[in-house]
Amino acid sequence: MNQYDLNLILNPNLSAEQVQIEKDYIETALKNVGAEVSNLDDLGNRRLAYQVGKDREGYYLMYTIKAGGNPEKDIASSLRLRDHVRRVLVVKDRPEWKTKKA
């Protein structure tokens, strides 16, 4: 199983209940693809580098997941269908570079 970073930006105007609903949906979508969540960083509302739609802020969620195969397209396509999801980025973690010892 490979390790991936899943970064999401949600609508900044969501209530706490709506954010929890989105988190539950994301975790269900990840389980449907065969991925397991190993870490979740909830960064909350942050200012965006540029305007996305009409929003200058976004609600950031950063997941560390483990999945087999090549789940990037499956995960991203299922999450982009949500109305409150503004951006999705799935990146495969690379192992640490091995350096030669002198």
From Swiss-Prot:
| InterPro entries reported in the protein's UniProt record | Ribosomal_bS6 (IPR000529), Ribosomal_bS6_sf (IPR035980), Ribosomal_S6_plastid/chlpt (IPR020814), Transl_elong_EF1B/ribsomal_bS6 (IPR014717)
Q: Origin, by domain of life? A: Bacteria
Gene3D superfamilies for the chain: 3.30.70.60
Q: Name one GO molecular function term.
A: small ribosomal subunit rRNA binding
CC annotations in GO: cytoplasm; ribonucleoprotein complex; ribosome
The Gene Ontology biological process annotation of the record reads: translation
Keywords in alphabetical order:
Ribonucleoprotein, Ribosomal protein, RNA-binding, rRNA-binding
* The keyword Lyase appears for this protein: no
Say what the protein does. Binds together with bS18 to 16S ribosomal RNA.
Name of the protein this chain belongs to: Small ribosomal subunit protein bS6
Species of origin reads Deinococcus deserti (strain DSM 17065 / CIP 109153 / LMG 22923 / VCD115)
